Amino acid sequence: MMAMNAKQPFGMHPVLQEPKFSSLHSGSEAMRRVCLPAPQLQGNIFGSFDESLLARAEALAAVDIVSHGKNHPFKPDATYHTMSSVPCTSTSPTVPISHPAALTSHPHHAVHQGLEGDLLEHISPTLSVSGLGAPEHSVMPAQIHPHHLGAMGHLHQAMGMSHPHAVAPHSAMPACLSDVESDPRELEAFAERFKQRRIKLGVTQADVGAALANLKIPGVGSLSQSTICRFESLTLSHNNMIALKPVLQAWLEEAEAAYREKNSKPELFNGSERKRKRTSIAAPEKRSLEAYFAIQPRPSSEKIAAIAEKLDLKKNVVRVWFCNQRQKQKRMKYSAVH
């Protein structure tokens, strides 16, 4: 019987070494080592009997915990087993153990363990971006308290909120530009400036309206003369003034560029300018030319140049006038004969 009692605890231990009650077995083993010395060292003949009593007490306690765990899913011993399984050596120096409750059985640790895993998936990229380093996943749940996770959650939220402020100045720039363009005083100043430049270029309002179609602006065709007139007189609606301003500004820039190019190369435009523009001679210069024509109807080229210089006229203008005057005299003589 002594041999049977001595073998009985060893028959019970494989059942108690299941992963579900490994923490209870380790706790009872620690209690046995502290409270009871080894039977072979004590030399007690009832050592094996004490071992069997302790084994039966462990089995009853295990059954009680299993029945209690069905009603209450929270297991402090399982939590303690999870916490005690973490090695004491620091494997991640970047995250120090600052909370003492992280190494003990915290009452709410097992409840929030799944939540911590989800939060760490979102926080770990933030830590790597901010330069804190990403620790190992097996050590993080045991070393970070839920309160620490809340603080890092606020840090992640603050980092996420920092991006709109960085973009805010860029998004505010178009609003400032639109305010400047929609200012009535700016529109009035541009309308007056446009009118003065148009007159200086020698272009009519109708020419401006017809030339807008040549700009190839999407949605913009030729406009009537009355529309350009109403823009210069500020009688259009405010929205139409705002919409028409960039179109007229584009035309004005192109017209001034063409005008500057024509002035820089006048020899390319003399022929077309002579056909398009008609010269008018004032009355005093006309009387002087008639006096020269009465003296010499066919002056030489040198005489024409001298007359043009004296009257402050172009040589070509004086030459054409003498030619036209001779044709006029021929018509008068022909009509008088017939």
Swiss-Prot record:
Residues 274-333 bind DNA. GO terms for biological process: axon extension; inner ear auditory receptor cell differentiation; inner ear development; inner ear morphogenesis; inner ear receptor cell differentiation; neuromuscular process controlling balance; neuron apoptotic process; positive regulation of transcription by RNA polymerase II. Coiled coil: none annotated. Residues 179-256 form the POU-specific domain. InterPro entries: HD (IPR001356), Homeobox_CS (IPR017970), Homeodomain-like_sf (IPR009057), Lambda_DNA-bd_dom_sf (IPR010982), POU (IPR013847), POU_dom (IPR000327), POU_domain_TF (IPR050255). GO terms for molecular function: DNA-binding transcription activator activity, RNA polymerase II-specific; DNA-binding transcription factor activity; RNA polymerase II cis-regulatory region sequence-specific DNA binding; sequence-specific DNA binding. Brain. SUPFAM superfamilies: Homeodomain-like, lambda repressor-like DNA-binding domains. GO terms for cellular component: cytoplasm; nucleoplasm; nucleus; transcription regulator complex. Acts as a transcriptional activator. Acts by binding to sequences related to the consensus octamer motif 5'-ATGCAAAT-3' in the regulatory regions of its target genes. Involved in the auditory system development, required for terminal differentiation of hair cells in the inner ear. This is POU domain, class 4, transcription factor 3. It comes from Mus musculus (Mouse).
